[in-house]
Swiss-Prot record:
Its EC number is 6.1.1.16. GO terms for cellular component: cytoplasm; cytosol. It is found in: Cytoplasm. This is Cysteine--tRNA ligase. ATP binds at residue 285. Belongs to the class-I aminoacyl-tRNA synthetase family. NCBIfam families: cysS. It comes from the Bacteria. A motif ('HIGH' region) lies at residues 30-40.
Length: 473
């Protein structure tokens, strides 16, 4: 039985899907105006791991991750670059897919784009107005009236009064309440716009996800995920919109928030992954401590980055530094070295192997605890190193594969590495051949010179009876 920590109820709950034959998960994706950063990498890898695990448990899963392809930042960046919005977003969607593929992230089943779902957004806004949950303002915008939704604040755990006191809310004379948020923005000169009952304009960000998830999944669904930064206001607003439009909620067993509200959500389980921190501070563009996936992949193998993300619990903050990535590289190298030294065979049932599998499953079923699951992989690798048991090595590879690790040829991983290491594989092989000749000629000075040169490039040699093997350090 899988248990999941539900942000909405603030507790771990047994995973019991609405329809076990049709499990549905929606994750907020990228706003495509720039290259993806490490925070995006964490969202992609974490929910890829969760999707893989649910499928491993036999659930028929439909995984949707949306693409925000219309937004203030997109409009501004396209204008700055002097290119069309379509050209800009197409370029960064392709870059996002390249980054995700490199990190071993399987493509979601559906990737809806906001611009392809405008009619659904307009229809939902019309319903919200009819239901008394939204109002058109004199400036041509349409706002959601938060005081008309009794459960507003349930996800962030704050009352409307708390939120008004604590949030920096921009003053807007057209709103009835400072916390009211925009559903439809009136057109501005030179910006893309669509026709609507309230005049030309474009959707607000929050309505996009409500309309796309309802269009694909219906009124209620199982899992909604995203980064912790989306909990408020984005996900809070999604609940208000979706429940405000349809009136349909998932039963949360009459649960209440800590200030006594009834819980009313169209999603049964809300999941949020933790922030990435750099030197103890949240990674963000404004602080300038910001790394794109591409920058990191110039230094580190993509599987090292995936492993670095999965070594931490998905809800914990993840501290980024070169030292932490070097540590992840060393740890993953140890696992691949085990598989190189004991080539895996198809695992057969065995008492020892079955016990490792059971413990791996127990860890993953406990709110996707990859920290404990990875610890099981290291224990299993230790056993393989002691016994040289090819079937246990096969078990190690198979368990790693469940979370998207250890599927490459070990030699290819160990000899691969960032191009910035300076020496190509061919140059390394050539130097090793020259060193071998120098040793045969008893030219120890030349042999040592070549070893030192390789050492400078972090190439580690291992001399054994069958010759010399190497890997990148």
């Amino acid at each position: 039985m899988t248990t999941i920590y539900n942000t909405l109820t603030r507790q771990k709950e047994p995973f019991s899907p609405i329809d076990p034959e049709n499990v549905r998960m929606y994750v907020c994706g990228m706003t495509v105006y720039d290259y993806c950063h490490l925070g995006h990498a964490r969202v992609m890898v974490v929910f890829d791991m969760i999707a893989r695990w649910l499928r491993e448990c036999g659930y028929p899963l439909t995984y949707v991750r949306n693409i925000t392809d219309i937004d203030d930042k997109i409009i501004a960046r396209a204008a700055e670059n002097g290119e069309t919005i379509g050209k800009l977003t197409a370029r960064f969607i392709q870059a996002m897919h390249e980054d995700a593929d490199a990190l071993g992230v399987l493509r979601p089943d559906i990737e809806p784009k906001a611009t392809e779902n405008i009619p659904q957004m307009i229809a939902m806004i019309e319903t919200l107005i009819q239901n008394g949950k939204a109002y058109p303002a004199a400036n041509g915008d349409v706002y959601y009236a938060v005081r008309e939704f009794a459960a507003y604040g349930q996800l962030s755990g704050k009352s409307l009064d708390d939120l008004r006191a604590g949030e920096r809310v921009e003053v807007d004379g057209f709103k009835r309440d400072p916390l009211d948020f925009v559903l439809w923005k009136a057109a501005k000169a030179g910006e893309p716009a669509w026709e609507s009952p309230w005049g030309n304009g474009r959707p607000g960000w929050h309505i996009e996800c409500s309309a796309m998830s309802e269009n694909l999944f219906g009124d209620t669904f199982d899992i909604h995920g995203g980064g912790a930064d989306l909990q408020f206001p984005h996900h809070e607003n999604e609940i208000a919109q979706s429940v405000g439009a349809t009136g349909h909620t998932c039963g949360h067993h009459h649960a209440q928030t800590h200030h006594g509200q009834s819980i009313a959500s169209h999603v049964k389980y809300w999941l949020h992954n933790g922030f990435i921190r750099v030197d103890g501070e949240k990674m963000s563009k404004s602080l300038g401590n910001f790394f794109t996936i591409r920058e990191v992949l110039k230094q580190y193998d993509p599987e090292v980055v995936r492993f670095f993300i999965l070594r931490a619990h998905y809800r914990s903050p993840l501290n980024y530094s070169d030292a932490h990535l070097d540590d992840a590289k060393g740890a993953l190298t140890r696992l691949y070295t085990t598989l190189k030294n004991t080539p895996p065979a198809d695992p057969m049932p065995s008492e020892a192997g079955d016990d490792y599998t059971r413990r791996f499953y127990v860890a993953m079923n406990d709110d996707f605890d990859t920290v404990k699951a990875v610890a099981v992989l290291f224990e299993l690798a230790g056993e393989v190193n002691k016994t040289n048991d090819a079937q246990l090595a096969g078990r190690l590879k198979a368990l790693g594969g469940i979370i998207g690790l250890l599927q490459r040829d070990p030699t290819e991983f160990l000899q691969g590495g960032a191009a910035s290491d300076g020496l190509s594989n061919e140059e390394i092989e050539d130097l090793i051949a020259r060193r071998k000749q120098a040793r045969a000629d008893k030219n120890w000075a030349e042999s040592d010179r070549i070893r030192d040169l390789l050492n400078e490039h972090k190439i580690i040699l291992e001399d054994n009876a069958g010759g010399t093997t190497w890997r990148r350090g």
